[in-house]
């Protein structure tokens, strides 16, 4: 355990087999599993197993492949890295999801992060129903934008002004253009395995689906769009210093995931973020935290509150839309005032700030303000992660992993894992077998070893116990 300056809490270092972090949570915290976000559903994980079948999913996916490239609208959903039949989802509620074959799963994907208070929360749905009565999109300002903007600005240390967009990719595209406009410099530094969306400059040595499919980069990205993207291994300060030395006066910004969630779950070494902050200041470059995953998940103020490091600019997404399409970028006022129409840096969007996304975001953030929220996430995620690692040790598998609050990950590798190169040494074939086995046991993890997992306020200790028991059963079988 190592204290984080300015936060007043402890955070677990990378877990390996046999290491058990002290879970730091308030005595008798409020149970953060609201009755409004849970329902009683007959679950395959809660009752004697019926025969597991994906026949309807198989039929639907076969048809989908004739209609959409690969049968999906985002590559990782196709199960390429884990094998087997992709599941077609019919409904979600609380911590559970049900496919069209009637199988139910404890869900640790959470729509890739947004569902931090649980799926289809009753309070959020009720608020959306009221908002929809007034219309779904105005293409003009609405008061809800002010409300959510005030909430984001008050929560995130770096943000003095914010611009809402429609996705995390869009947020990263906008913030990159802004950094170049503000500094007058062309180059950016990103880290190997970090994923900042599918825009051309960010797909150089990217994580997420690019890593899942084993692609070095993506075809179609012209050299003109990628030649100013410099890369370094995550957690490697000397590599960053060398890039600044080689490209003096040319680097506009460093952009990074403060905790990597798209190349496995990789935590920053204790001095890494502080050193990056120091280097950018010394070189008059901007520091950008991509908090699309970590924002409002590691703490109400995101990773920057958790670690006590304040960047110049921040991107957000996922949670701030409560499950609806959304993104945002924000930061220092003097930088943000360059964004049109206040300044010359142009960026626009038809559906940006639409009332539905604003409503869902407002009511999700309100729920996160409740007492004991992040202590509860820390508790259940710690139990889950350590339980899986203990099961791996008990059954003779080399595994490593870690967690922070409501975000976690594990790899079939000895560890430690400090960067993408370390993560790629993991046993992806074994993970595929583990993954398929867990599906049959009614547990849904991300269908790639290189994607972080997420817990929610709707997950219960019973969910965790069932998951750990299922993991031990499957690990024995493989």
Curated annotation (Swiss-Prot):
- EC number(s) of the enzyme? 5.4.3.8
Reactions that this protein is recorded to catalyse: (S)-4-amino-5-oxopentanoate = 5-aminolevulinate
Name any one GO molecular function.
Answer: transaminase activity
GO (cellular component) term, any one = chloroplast
Task: Recite the UniProt keywords alphabetically.
Answer: Chlorophyll biosynthesis, Chloroplast, Isomerase, Plastid, Porphyrin biosynthesis, Pyridoxal phosphate, Transit peptide
Q: Which residues carry this modification: N6-(pyridoxal phosphate)lysine?
A: 318
Main subcellular location of this protein, as a coarse class? plastid
- What Pfam family is a match for this entry? Aminotran_3
Which pathway is it part of? Answer: Porphyrin-containing compound metabolism; protoporphyrin-IX biosynthesis; 5-aminolevulinate from L-glutamyl-tRNA(Glu): step 2/2; Porphyrin-containing compound metabolism; chlorophyll biosynthesis
- Cellular location of this protein? Plastid, Chloroplast
Identify the InterPro entries for this entry: 4pyrrol_synth_GluAld_NH2Trfase, Aminotrans_3, Aminotrans_3_PPA_site, PyrdxlP-dep_Trfase, PyrdxlP-dep_Trfase_major, PyrdxlP-dep_Trfase_small
| Essential cofactor(s) | pyridoxal 5'-phosphate
Name its GO BP terms in alphabetical order: chlorophyll biosynthetic process; protoporphyrinogen IX biosynthetic process
According to the record's subunit comment, the protein's assembly and interactions are: Homodimer.
Q: Which family does this protein fall into? A: Belongs to the class-III pyridoxal-phosphate-dependent aminotransferase family. HemL subfamily.
Query: Could you tell me what this protein is called?
Result: Glutamate-1-semialdehyde 2,1-aminomutase, chloroplastic
Species this chain originates from: Nicotiana tabacum
């Amino acid at each position: 355990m190592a204290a984080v300056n300015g936060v007043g809490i402890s955070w677990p270092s990378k877990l390996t087999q046999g290491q058990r972090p002290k879970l730091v949570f308030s005595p008798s915290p409020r149970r953060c599993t609201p009755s409004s976000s849970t329902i009683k559903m007959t679950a395959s994980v809660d009752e004697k197993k019926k025969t597991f079948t994906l026949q309807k999913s198989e039929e639907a996916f076969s048809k989908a492949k004739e209609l959409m490239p690969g049968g999906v609208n985002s590559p990782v959903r196709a199960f390429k890295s884990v094998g087997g039949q992709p599941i077609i989802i019919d409904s979600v509620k609380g911590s559970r999801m049900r496919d069209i074959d009637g199988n139910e799963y404890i869900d640790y994907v959470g729509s890739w992060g947004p569902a931090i208070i649980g799926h289809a929360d009753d309070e959020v749905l009720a608020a959306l129903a009221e908002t929809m009565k007034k219309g779904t999109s105005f293409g003009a300002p609405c008061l809800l934008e002010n409300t959510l903007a005030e909430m984001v600005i008050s929560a995130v240390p770096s943000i003095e002004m914010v611009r809402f967009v429609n996705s995390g990719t869009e947020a990263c595209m906008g913030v990159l253009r802004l950094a170049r406009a503000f500094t007058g410099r062309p180059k950016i530094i990103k880290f190997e395995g970090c994923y900042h969306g599918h825009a051309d400059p960010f797909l150089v040595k990217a994580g997420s689906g690019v890593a899942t499919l084993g692609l070095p980069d993506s075809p179609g990205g012209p050299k003109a769009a990628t030649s100013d993207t410099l890369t370094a291994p995550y957690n490697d300060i000397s590599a960053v210093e060398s890039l600044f030395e080689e490209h003096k006066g040319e680097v506009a910004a460093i952009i990074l995931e403060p905790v990597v969630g798209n190349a496995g779950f990789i935590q920053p070494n204790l001095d890494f973020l502080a050193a990056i902050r120091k280097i950018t200041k010394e070189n008059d470059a901007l520091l950008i935290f991509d908090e699309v995953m970590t924002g409002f998940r590691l703490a109400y103020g995101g990773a920057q509150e958790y670690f006590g490091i304040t960047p110049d600019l921040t991107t957000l997404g996922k949670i701030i839309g409560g499950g609806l399409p959304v993104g945002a970028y924000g930061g220092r006022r003097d930088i943000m005032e360059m964004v049109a129409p206040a300044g010359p840096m142009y960026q626009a969007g038809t559906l940006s700030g639409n009332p539905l996304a604003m409503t869902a975001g407002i009511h999700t953030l309100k729920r996160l303000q409740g007492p004991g929220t992040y202590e509860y996430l820390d508790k259940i995620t710690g139990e889950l992660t350590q339980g899986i690692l203990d099961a791996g040790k008990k059954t003779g598998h080399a595994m490593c992993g870690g967690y922070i609050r409501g975000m976690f990950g594990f790899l079939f590798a000895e560890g430690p894992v400090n960067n993408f190169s370390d993560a790629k040494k993991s046993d992806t074939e074994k993970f595929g077998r583990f993954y398929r086995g867990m599906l049959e046991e009614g547990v849904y993890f991300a269908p790639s070893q290189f994607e972080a997992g997420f817990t929610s306020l709707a997950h219960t200790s019973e969910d965790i116990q069932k998951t750990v028991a299922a993991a031990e059963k499957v690990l024995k079988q493989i």
